[in-house]
Design a protein with these regions (language model features):
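Bacterial Sec-dependent N-terminal signal peptides
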Residues: 1-35
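Polar/charged alpha-helical tracts
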Residues: 5, 50, 401-402
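Intrinsically disordered, low-complexity regulatory regions of eukaryotic regulatory proteins
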Residues: 6-7, 292, 437, 463
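Residue-level detector of functionally pivotal "anchor" positions at catalytic/ligand-binding pockets or at interdomain
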Residues: 475
Length: 475
């Protein structure tokens, strides 16, 4: 993102922590996903083989030797500066193993201390067998953009940073970027506003700029090909805020490009995400374009930013994701219930605690340090809640019966439009008795862009619909 940011914290009156030990009415929940193993659940934290949050933003996927490799920005909750690029691997796109930080912060230069590193993309060069990584580098004010590149002999690194990516002898001084590899092995660099560069045979430089400024105002570029038609996706420029992304089509990478419009219903803000990549998902003899989007959460990107991955419908130049699926089966490309063997812990019969207000069947609070401690039995717990324009961050923790914290993270309840959905399914623990703790932090996702325009929430509200105790799930 070509933007600078300012975090604002909203404070409200301090109240003491509240311990809620109450009897919840149990309601059975159907579980369509019980026998499925390859489930993607959007808009919630994903956990890797170490039980840590999958931290790979602005990402891409490379399929190599029968395995999927996810590369992304390894984000921090404390700073927007470059920390490193991460790599995860999977054999099913659902369960991820942390490989390593494949490109760490450098001692100096474009990716040195107090620099920006974003939009990491990786391609395997057909002519050399080398893996080449591309990224946007910048200063923290986003006033020194430059495309950089790194190389590795193995897909999971470590990658060696090679410096600025050039056309001729000139560095390409741009910011938001993507890549596309055609079926003939030709590689392309995609740039904000719609520039397209064809890469050299070894992928180490740009050979020619094929298209210039065909999408003014567009960023987060991504491209794919389906049945001989090229699709070029962009978002609008609204800082970390979500917007309605759009696409163009062409019979060749060099154009002519024709605007196709939105690919998600207007006003849905691309299901609260921003395009980062389109992965060609093989299904038998067919290839399905899988949209990959970021649900940013500034300033707490490491903890609270999540992902939206969805199969796209591309037919004769028409592109769409007609409806949002929070959870879907990769094998069948169908929507499923994300929760297995769940019991809803109804909030309706709970007594109203200080700091929490009942609104119908919801419990809400915007008072900093307001706490709910909810006993549950099972292996996991899920929170279903409403994100809206007043939402803030909740600190969600799982404690054992002795009060030891087993897991803790921030969850974002902000959205420009009201949306009730699963906000988190906690990591899985041994079956037993636990406490789910939900605490209002008093912090809002708020930021400004270079023009000092303000974005984000106007409060720090946490709105709970249901708590679900889970005995078994594939998430």
């Amino acid at each position: 993102m070509n933007l600078s940011f300012l975090m604002e914290k909203r404070h409200s009156y301090f109240i003491s922590m509240i311990l809620l030990w109450t009897s919840f009415s149990l309601v059975s929940q159907s579980s369509c996903a019980q026998n499925q193993e390859k489930i993607i659940c959007n808009g919630i934290p994903w956990f890797d083989d170490q039980g840590k949050i999958v931290n790979a933003h602005g990402a891409c996927i490379v399929e190599d030797a029968g395995r999927y490799y996810l590369f992304g920005e390894y984000r921090s909750d404390e700073t927007n500066s470059f920390v490193g690029f991460s790599c995860y691997s999977s054999d099913d796109l659902s369960n991820w193993k942390f490989e390593r930080i494949v490109l760490p912060i450098q001692k100096e230069g474009l990716l040195g201390p107090n620099r920006i590193g974003e939009r990491v993309k990786v391609m395997k060069c057909p002519s050399t067998g080398e893996y080449v990584m591309y990224m946007h580098t910048d200063d923290t004010k986003y006033c020194d953009p430059c495309i950089g590149y790194a190389t590795s002999k193995t897909i999971n690194g470590e990658y060696i940073f090679q410096g600025p990516f050039k056309i001729g002898n000139e560095p390409i001084r741009m910011w938001d970027m993507g890549t596309f590899q055609d079926t003939d092995g030709t590689g392309y660099l995609l740039i904000h506003e719609g520039d397209i560069y064809r890469l050299s045979e070894d992928y180490h430089s740009a050979e020619k700029r094929l298209v210039k400024n065909m999408a003014p105002g567009g960023e987060s570029p991504a491209m794919f090909k389906k049945e001989g038609i090229y699709y070029f996706l962009f978002s609008n420029k609204t800082s970390w805020e979500k917007n309605d992304n759009y696409y163009f089509t062409a019979p060749a990478v060099g154009g002519p490009w024709k605007k196709g419009g939105l690919f998600v219903p207007e006003g849905k803000l691309t299901y609260n995400s921003q395009t980062t990549f389109v992965f060609p998902l093989t299904q038998g003899k067919d290839t399905i374009p899988m949209f990959m989007g970021d649900r940013w959460s500034f300033p707490h990107q490491a903890s609270a930013a999540t992902y939206v991955w969805m199969p796209m419908q591309a037919d004769k130049g028409k592109l769409s994701i007609p409806e949002y699926w929070q959870a879907w089966d990769i094998k069948t490309l169908s929507q499923v219930d994300a929760l297995d063997n769940g019991q809803i812990l109804s909030l309706r019969k709970t007594r109203s605690e200080a700091g929490w207000e009942r609104r119908g069947e919801q419990l809400c609070s915007n008072l900093k340090n307001s706490v709910l401690n909810i006993p549950f039995k099972g292996t996991q717990a899920a929170i279903i809640g409403e994100a809206n324009s007043h939402g803030g961050y909740a600190k969600v923790s799982v404690l054992n019966r002795k009060g030891k914290t087993l897991y803790s993270s921030l969850i974002d309840f902000y959205s420009k439009y009201p949306e009730s959905a699963i906000r988190i399914v906690t990591p899985s623990f041994a079956k037993g008795k636990y406490i789910l703790r939900i605490e209002v932090t008093g912090i809002s996702p708020v930021w400004t862009d270079k023009t000092k325009a303000r974005y984000g929430s106007d409060d720090c509200l946490v709105t709970l619909d249901k708590i679900v105790a889970v005995s078994y799930t594939h998430l």
